[in-house]
Design a protein with these regions (language model features):
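ATP/NTP phosphate-donor binding region
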Residues: 1-89
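Glycine/serine-rich anion-binding loops at beta->alpha junctions
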Residues: 87-105, 148-153, 285
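A glycine/threonine-rich phosphate-anchoring loop and its flanking beta-alpha core
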Residues: 20, 24, 110-219
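Active-site segments that bind and position negatively charged phosphate/pyrophosphate groups
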Residues: 211-304
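Short Gly/Thr/Asp-enriched flexible loops that form oxyanion-binding sites at enzyme active sites
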Residues: 48-51, 78-79, 98-111, 156-157
């Protein structure tokens, strides 16, 4: 028997101009005090201000000091800020590190943890449900994600946070930690450094290939993995050749979405992902780069 799980997401807005849907989504959920979580680089580029302007007077505050690999210390700061600002929802603007740190915060808040409670053991203990159930506590705070990379973290209910003291990555999650709404606007990726954007596109190829090769792959995961790889293989060279090509960026975002359908549905990953978690948590190597290096080597090993 094969079982495919669907994430507890309501809507995905995709394409040029999709960011304009954000105020209507705030209205739909009745959020009066959303907290904006982003990065310092997106503040410097002006992208964070563009999103903050859409939030208007409702914006409860902004947190921007989210380092790569979502350290536990960042999760603790987010938990504290959410309480201090009396926020009622979250808008996460950024890549996988921002979105995963926000997932960690949502897991902690759902379990009633305070900032001082945030340890690796406490956060993994608060995680539950995986992809097997949506749960029943729909009073939990939720996230709207505006991705600026191609990591596809916005389509899963789980994420990686780093215990810097131990030098390892921890997987945390809850069915309702997945963003309830995703806004894929290619213009939101224009300020992302080329190396980061292109390497996270390679990470999506890694999702596709390892998902297709997984022993518990399904017809759904196979179909989406093949189409994701085809689209990304076409989009990445076009993005590299013309950084202003929004059609190529939109195709890459669609490919990222497709690439993670197997993983978010319960399909296992392979050694490239596993080694990537070790390198990321222990040595702060970006996951996009670990995929570029490890996937070819893992495939050669698997093919023997």
């Amino acid at each position: 028997m094969q079982t495919h799980h669907w994430p507890a997401q309501q809507r995905v807005h995709a394409g040029v101009g999709a960011l304009a849907a954000l105020p209507k989504e705030l209205d739909a959920f009745g959020w009066q005090r959303p907290l904006l979580i982003t990065t310092n680089s997106l503040i410097r580029s002006g992208m964070a201000e563009r999103v903050r302007a859409l939030l208007g007077d409702r914006c409860a505050g902004m947190v921007a000091d989210i380092p790569a690999h979502s350290p536990l210390e960042s999760v603790a700061r987010l938990v504290a800020k959410f309480g201090e600002t009396r926020a009622d929802g979250v808008v996460a603007l950024g890549g996988g590190s921002v979105i995963d740190a926000t997932k960690g915060m949502l897991v902690a808040l759902g379990a009633g943890l305070q900032a001082s409670d945030i340890t690796g053991k406490a956060l993994t203990g608060a995680s539950g449900g995986g992809t097997s159930a949506w749960g029943t506590d729909f009073s939990r705070p939720r996230m709207i994600a505006v991705p600026t990379t191609l990591s596809a973290a916005e389509f899963t209910s789980f994420g990686g946070v780093t215990d810097t003291a131990a030098g390892r990555k921890l997987m945390v999650g809850h069915p309702l930690a997945v963003p309830v709404v995703v806004i894929q606007d290619p213009s939101c990726t224009l300020d992302t450094p080329a190396e980061l954007l292109l390497s996270t596109g390679a990470r999506s190829v890694d999702h596709s290939v390892e998902g297709f090769c997984a022993p518990n792959a399904s017809p759904i995961s196979d179909a989406t993995a093949i189409e994701a790889a085809r689209r990304m293989w076409s989009a990445l060279p076009r993005m590299h050749a013309d950084p202003t090509d929004l059609a190529a960026r939109s195709d890459a975002q669609a490919a990222a979405w497709l690439s993670i359908q197997g993983r978010s549905g319960g399909v296992s990953h392979g050694a490239s992902h596993g080694i990537g978690y070790l390198l990321g948590g222990g040595f702060n190597v970006p996951h996009g780069l670990t995929s570029c290096v490890m996937l070819p080597a893992v495939l050669r090993c698997d093919g023997r």
